[in-house]
């Protein structure tokens, strides 16, 4: 970098040529097949030269057979070259087809960012210089380009620049590049390229102008600004003139007064270069900059340690700079943050708000607003602020109108966004009108725009979102106020309010009162009375309030006849309203009673099932006890030799069985032994459970253990089935499946790993399909100690880059839906929502790469028909779950207060009944002791301990009586 600047500055009359770097890029721009051909030709030439002059003599003295071999070798080389050419032609044809596909897709959706990038890459690979230039130009008009895209474009143009006109074209590209984002590397390239044109007219002034602008833009950059300072300083040092030495001194002093990394090295270099002693002012500025550097270092180190996009670190850095209040540094840190967070609308809003309120520099403010809407075109707040800023700084009407039209085509994600942008533009048009004139061009334009706004919301917006976004008719209300207050045209205002009421707003009291207040201020008493009478008849939400307003007006302005009529109408209306409310209350009470009856029925059914289950369980336990008693009586010898017993159970011969039968008959007791094998599945499960030792749960290993649930109950050997799945995450120490008393697998288990990172990696297997069911994998947490612990992988807030799709056919697969969604952008993730059994629910979540692709997909896919199912597509914004209020814990009189842990993880149940008779709950009054010790807790009577035990049926009867 420094060498290039120095050499170029010392030889101003020589035009710098593209070096090896540019040549290498030209090679990269060539098709891969051409490069292979050139490489093959070079290798052949080197081989011919390596043969030496004796090669021709050997050819002359060679035999006929040698000539045949040479012909064979030549034909082989020709065939190899032909194969390479065929491979290149095939690859070129494939690239051309892909280029055509991308161009067709961009003709449908020009805002597909990834398609633009891929098209430029393929055109550059094919060497289509004119087409790649046009593709880059089109993309730069729609999107701000990243530093990498600009540098690639600039390097290509620099390598092709041949004369002064081409150099001016490259200068224009540099000027466009530095406006998109703050890029120190682009400024450095700009400065170095301008050094190459120093021999032209005004070349020296051009170089200095570029470097000075670079210092103003990125010279304060603590980590990357040093390169700009060094390049500028070395350029000035290369010009050996006495007058230029002071320029180098000035650059050193300016650099040392700014907190930058490696300041000590720059100071040492200045001391070595300068022949004069260091001035005191320079030392003071240097020490002050060092002190500032120490304050900034924690924030810079936080940025270096964090990973992109580092939004939180940048926000903290911005807050710190805002407290200090240096405008240049505040602007720099905002620009640095936006390089990595260009798709964060809130960051653009905060930056533009600071410029609007603090700096108020026209060019800077409008430039930032323009970049903001190019980066986040779907954010209506940025467009609104842009229009206000343009009006604030006095831009012409045509420019503001064109910007508004661009906003309408930006593709907002909500219908209300269009209402907001229309309101901002209509407010601007209203401020242009001189209402002292009866008629003007501006007033006619305002009225025509009000009409167009209503048509646009009714047609364009309602067709796209199934709603106009303006249910309260705010735009029509604004129009009515303009006509009534500023144009004295109450007739038009009344027509507008009639239209507002016919759009479903006549039942709201606030709408009638708004109209009444307008008539009160700019109309007459007759129309006020008429409006209130209509309001009394139509209002359904707050009729009492409207009736009160009518009576108040008649009390102050009406006659006796008006008062009587108002009383009659209000009483009739309120009586009807009360009757309707009573009917609604009765209907609601009937529904509540019906729900209670259903709940009681469900309780009764559950109680019966529970009693039946307990009865079966009791019978099973009695049967097992009988079997155990029988085994104890006849199996004493087998208990002494358990290994022998297991062998005889599986390999008992018929002769041994008959001998045992004879032995039992002689002893006078009959014992029937069933030697037939039981069900294989139950035998295997029972033996697996019997052979597996019981392991107590060790809570100290929760960090290396995961809990796996929702597994199919039909798995015969869970450990064998699950071990290969989890071994990809790391060493599996143990898998502990849980079985029932009968040896059946209960569908969940614990998996213990050797390392904690393996357990964390295993959580990524959550929702993996195992034999048709989604397997749930969650951390191993003791719910008794953490009752509120819940694991939910997905966000429950608004995600503008993710779509929620409903109404899908159950037969729709993930691959089919992904193919549909890919047509509108890059799909990062797609998830079909299923139930616990793995069956689809007709819902899906689709995550796109950015918000613009998601908004385009909503507009294109909403209302689409898939297999006769009309799907609905919206931005993912799950509704907030209501947190149930914790009921007040009531205890029986005299009952001891129990801690929450005694009730379990969920606390007390909803129904808390004290099943202790009231007679036993009453306790004698504690003796009052004024100066004695506090009485001890009352001891419960011993009668309570002798109360008969109640069965489940008794409890159910008590609940049903309630």
Swiss-Prot record:
Comp. bias regions, Basic residues: 603-618
Biased segments, Low complexity type: 1-21
Basic and acidic residues composition-biased segments: 591-602, 680-696
Motif Nuclear localization signal per UniProt: ranges: 602-609
Disruption phenotype: Knockout of Sart3 is embryonic lethal.
Record PROSITE patterns: RRM (PS50102)
CDD domains per UniProt: RRM1_SART3, RRM2_SART3
Chain intervals for the UniProt region annotation (Required for interaction with USP4): 488-521
GO biological process terms, semicolon-separated: cell morphogenesis; hematopoietic stem cell proliferation; homeostasis of number of cells; mRNA splicing, via spliceosome; nucleosome assembly; regulation of gene expression; regulation of RNA metabolic process; spliceosomal snRNP assembly
General function of this protein: U6 snRNP-binding protein that functions as a recycling factor of the splicing machinery. Promotes the initial reassembly of U4 and U6 snRNPs following their ejection from the spliceosome during its maturation. Also binds U6atac snRNPs and may function as a recycling factor for U4atac/U6atac spliceosomal snRNP, an initial step in the assembly of U12-type spliceosomal complex. The U12-type spliceosomal complex plays a role in the splicing of introns with non-canonical splice sites. May also function as a substrate-targeting factor for deubiquitinases like USP4 and USP15.
Modified residues (Omega-N-methylarginine): 906
N-acetylalanine modifications at: 2
Pfam families xrefs: HAT_PRP39_C (PF23241), HAT_PRP39_N (PF23240), LSM_int_assoc (PF16605), Lsm_interact (PF05391), RRM_1 (PF00076)
Residue numbers carrying Phosphoserine: 10, 216, 651, 795, 852
GO cellular component, one term: U6atac snRNP
Domain RRM: 704-782, 801-878
Region (Necessary and sufficient for U6 snRNA binding): 538-952
Protein name: Spliceosome associated factor 3, U4/U6 recycling protein
Main location: nucleus
PANTHER family for the chain: PRE-MRNA PROCESSING PROTEIN PRP39-RELATED, RRM DOMAIN-CONTAINING PROTEIN
Region entry Disordered, spans: 1-92, 591-696, 880-962
Location of region: Mediates interaction with PRPF3: 2-352
Intrachain disulfide bonds: none
Subunit structure: Component of the 7SK snRNP complex at least composed of P-TEFb (composed of CDK9 and CCNT1/cyclin-T1), HEXIM1, HEXIM2, BCDIN3, SART3 proteins and 7SK and U6 snRNAs. Interacts with AGO1 and AGO2. Interacts with PRPF3 and USP4; the interaction with PRPF3 is direct and recruits USP4 to its substrate PRPF3. Interacts with USP15; the interaction is direct.
């Amino acid at each position: 970098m420094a060498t290039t600047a120095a050499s170029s500055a010392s030889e101003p009359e020589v035009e710098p040529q593209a070096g090896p770097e540019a040549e290498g890029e030209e090679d990269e721009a060539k098709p891969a097949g051409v490069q292979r051909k050139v490489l093959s030709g070079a290798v052949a030439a080197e081989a011919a030269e390596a043969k030496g002059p004796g090669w021709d003599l050997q050819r002359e003295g060679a035999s006929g057979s040698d000539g045949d071999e040479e012909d064979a070798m030549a034909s082989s080389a020709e065939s190899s070259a032909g194969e390479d050419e065929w491979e290149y032609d095939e690859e070129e044809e494939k690239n051309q087809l892909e280029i055509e596909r991308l161009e067709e897709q961009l003709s449908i959706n020009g805002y597909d960012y990834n398609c633009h990038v891929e098209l430029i890459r393929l055109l550059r690979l094919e060497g289509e210089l004119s087409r790649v230039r046009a593709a880059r130009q089109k993309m730069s008009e729609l999107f701000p380009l990243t530093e990498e895209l600009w540098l690639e474009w600039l390097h290509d143009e620099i390598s092709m620049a041949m004369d002064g006109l081409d150099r001016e074209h490259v200068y224009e590209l540099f000027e466009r590049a530095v406006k998109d984002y703050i890029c120190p590397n682009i400024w450095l390239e700009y400065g170095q390229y301008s050094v190459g044109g120093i021999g032209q007219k005004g070349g020296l002034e051009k170089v200095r102008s570029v470097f000075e602008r670079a210092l103003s833009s990125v010279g304060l950059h603590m980590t990357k600004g040093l390169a700009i300072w060094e390049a500028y300083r070395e350029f000035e040092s290369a010009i050996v003139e006495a007058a230029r030495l002071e320029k180098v001194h000035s650059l050193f002093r300016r650099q040392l007064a700014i907190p930058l990394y490696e300041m000590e090295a720059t100071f040492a270099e200045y001391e070595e270069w300068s022949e004069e002693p260091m001035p005191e002012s320079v030392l003071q500025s240097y020490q002050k900059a060092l002190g500032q550097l120490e304050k900034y270092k924690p924030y810079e180190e936080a940025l270096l340690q964090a990973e992109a996009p580092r939004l939180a670190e940048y926000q903290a850095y911005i807050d710190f700079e805002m407290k200090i209040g240096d405008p240049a540094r505040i602007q720099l840190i905002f620009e640095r943050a936006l390089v990595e967070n260009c798709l964060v609308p809130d960051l653009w809003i905060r930056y533009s708000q600071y410029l609007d309120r603090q700096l108020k520099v026209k060019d800077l403010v409008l430039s930032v607003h323009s970049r903001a809407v190019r980066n986040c075109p779907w954010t209506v707040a940025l467009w609104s602020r842009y229009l206000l800023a343009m009006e604030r700084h006095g831009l012409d009407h045509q420019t503001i109108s064109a910007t508004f039209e661009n906003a309408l085509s930006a593709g907002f994600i909500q219908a209300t966004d269009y209402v907001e942008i229309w309101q901002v533009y209509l407010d601007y048009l209203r401020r242009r009108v001189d209402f002292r004139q009866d008629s003007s061009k501006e007033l006619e334009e305002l009225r025509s725009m009000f009409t167009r706004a209503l048509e646009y919301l009714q047609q364009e917006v309602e067709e796209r979102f199934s709603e106009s976004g303006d249910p309260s008719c705010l735009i029509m209300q604004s129009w009515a106020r303009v006509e009534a207050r500023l144009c004295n045209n109450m007739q038009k205002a009344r027509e507008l309010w009639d239209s507002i009421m016919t759009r479903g707003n006549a039942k709201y009291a606030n709408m009638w009162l708004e109209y009444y207040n307008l008539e009160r201020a700019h109309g007459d008493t007759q129309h006020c009375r008429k409006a209130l009478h209509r309001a009394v008849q139509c209002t359904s939400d707050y009729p009492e309030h409207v009736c009160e307003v009518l009576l108040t007006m008649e009390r102050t302005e009406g006659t006796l006849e008006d008062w009587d009529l108002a009383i009659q109408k209000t009483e009739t209306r309120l009586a009807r309203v009360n009757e309707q409310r009573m009917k609604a209350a009765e209907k609601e009470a009937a529904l509540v009673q019906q729900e209670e009856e259903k709940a009681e029925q469900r309780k009764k059914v559950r109680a019966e099932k529970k009693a039946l289950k307990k009865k079966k369980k009791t019978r099973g336990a009695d049967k097992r006890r009988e079997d155990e008693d029988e085994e104890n009586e006849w199996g004493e010898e087998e208990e002494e030799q358990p290994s022998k017993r297991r062998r005889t159970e599986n390999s008992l011969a018929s002769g041994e069985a008959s001998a045992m039968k004879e032995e039992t008959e002689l002893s006078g007791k009959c014992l029937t032994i069933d030697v037939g094998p039981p069900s294989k599945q139950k035998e295997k499960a029972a033996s697996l459970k019997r052979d597996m030792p019981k392991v107590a749960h060790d809570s100290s290993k929760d960090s290396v253990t995961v809990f796996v649930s929702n597994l199919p109950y039909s798995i015969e050997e869970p450990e064998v089935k699950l071990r290969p799945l989890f071994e990809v995450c790391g060493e599996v120490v143990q898998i502990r499946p849980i079985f029932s008393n009968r040896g059946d697998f209960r569908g969940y288990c614990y998996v213990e790993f050797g390392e904690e990172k393996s357990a964390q990696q295993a959580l990524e297997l959550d929702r993996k399909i195992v034999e048709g069911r989604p397997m749930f994998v969650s951390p191993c947490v003791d719910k008794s100690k953490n009752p509120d612990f819940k694991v939910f992988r997905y966000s429950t807030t608004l995600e503008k880059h993710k779509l929620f799709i409903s109404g899908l056919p159950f037969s729709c697969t993930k691959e089919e839906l992904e193919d549909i969604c890919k047509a509108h952008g890059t799909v990062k993730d797609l998830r079909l929502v299923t139930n616990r059994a793995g069956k689809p629910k007709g819902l899906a979540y689709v995550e796109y790469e950015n918000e613009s692709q998601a908004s385009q997909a909503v507009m294109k896919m909403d209302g689409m028909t898939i297999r006769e199912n009309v799907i609905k597509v919206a931005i993912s914004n799950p509704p907030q779950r209501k947190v149930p209020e914790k009921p007040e814990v009531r205890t029986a009189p005299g009952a001891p207060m129990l801690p929450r842990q005694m009730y379990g993880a969920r606390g007390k149940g909803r129904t808390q009944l004290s099943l202790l008779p009231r007679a036993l709950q009453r306790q004698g009054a504690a003796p009052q002791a004024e100066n004695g010790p506090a009485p001890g807790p009352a001891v419960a009577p011993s009668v309570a301990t002798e109360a008969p035990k109640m069965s489940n049926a008794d409890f159910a009867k008590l609940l049903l009586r309630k």
